[in-house]
Amino acid sequence: MSSGLDWMTDLAPVHAIRRKVADRANLPNRMELAGRQAPPAREEQRVNGEDDQARFARVVLPHLADAYALARWLTGDGADAEDVVQDACLRAFRGISGFGEGNARAWVLTIVRHTAYTWLGKNRPATLVVTDDLEAVERAEVARRGTDAEAETPETELIAKADAASLEAAIKKLPPPFRETLVLRDVQGLDYKEIAKVTGVPIGTVMSRLARARQRVMTTIAKEHHDAAG
């Protein structure tokens, strides 16, 4: 029996994105996208001896699966996620010469996140929430919990035990700021500093959003179990 999260291990969309990005950006063919050296470029296109195509293949392509997963969680639809990642890859390609050899995964996911929110703003504005109103509550939550955000909590234990379909449904109900934070941490394994960089908020806000996201997911799953038992 397939689970609700089977799409996370399905690489077909990732391969499709690779092909479409290659076609749209005139990038190397599929063999080159898989890791072979791209053809030599003009000297002015090179950064430290590496042309833009080879740099893109080295920096961006290894993180396409994570990029698609984040876009899929944010948009809630596989085809929409493919469109978002394609656009994000083109943005990344245009800006690849400015990448400073830092955390490539965080850099790519930041672009994907921005692209996803732009797409949502144009296509589903009602799904977006204003995050400014959350800040005061989040600061209070950080003060209450302190800085030990890594510790196991009842929320994380219940989430770990939940079946995949229930978990996906509960995560989809989260407001985007909470959803992306939980996905980046509990699904994709980014640390708090990386999440803060991707989302553009302080680490304390990341901690608060993660705690509140886990609590909401736990509440949703618990209610589902209660309703099923009743």
Summary of predicted features, one role per range:
Residues 86, 97, 113, 121, ...:
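Residue-level detection of the helix-turn-helix DNA-binding "recognition helix"
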Residues 67, 71, 108, 112-120:
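Hydrophobic-face residues of short alpha-helical interaction/recognition segments
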Residues 1-62, 121, 127-177, 190-200, ...:
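Intrinsic, short, N-terminal disordered tails of RNA polymerase sigma-factor systems
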